[in-house]
Amino acid sequence: MKKLRCILLIDDDEPTNFWNHFLLTKQNCAEHVVIAKSGREALDYHRHCMEAPVQSELYHWPDLIFLDINMPRMNGWEFLEKYISLPWEGHRKALVVFLTTSLFPEDLAMAEAMPEVAGLENKPLTPATLENIWKLHFPEYP
């Protein structure tokens, strides 16, 4: 699988972030894997990306976002609503995949109804999950 430039993990759970970061690094999925521990931190990161020079060493525009649904203060749905409303002139939106332990049918139905959401996967990431995401959404990256 070919590397993406940047993957953003948005999750408040440190063990999950540790595992997902480890797996993405081990599988050589991206040049940069960035962790945001809250929706607010992720929005701040995107604002910095928009303000940073194109070749910034600190902020890398994500190609893929793995987003937790259940987080305190700002859940994944609230983050996504604010993310979609950011000023996108000259910038491309990242592919968003929810990573969750939620078994609520409402979450699956909402994810399927939103064109901004590319999928909903169970936590934690696995090599098979990554392979499926690459086959579906990044076929140019064999």
What kind of feature is each model-predicted range?
Residues H21-F22, E78, G90-V97, L103-L120, ...:
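Alpha4 helix (beta4-alpha4-beta5 surface) of REC/receiver domains from two-component response regulators
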Residues M71:
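Receiver (REC) domain active-site loop signature in two-component systems and cognate sites
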Residues M50, V54-F66:
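Active-site beta3 strand of CheY-like receiver
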Residues P124-H137:
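C-terminal output helix
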Residues E57-H60, I84-R92:
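Conserved phosphotransfer cores of two-component systems
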Residues I10-D13, S38, D68:
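Acidic di-acidic motifs
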Residues I35-C49, G76:
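Helix N-cap/capping motif at the beta->alpha junctions
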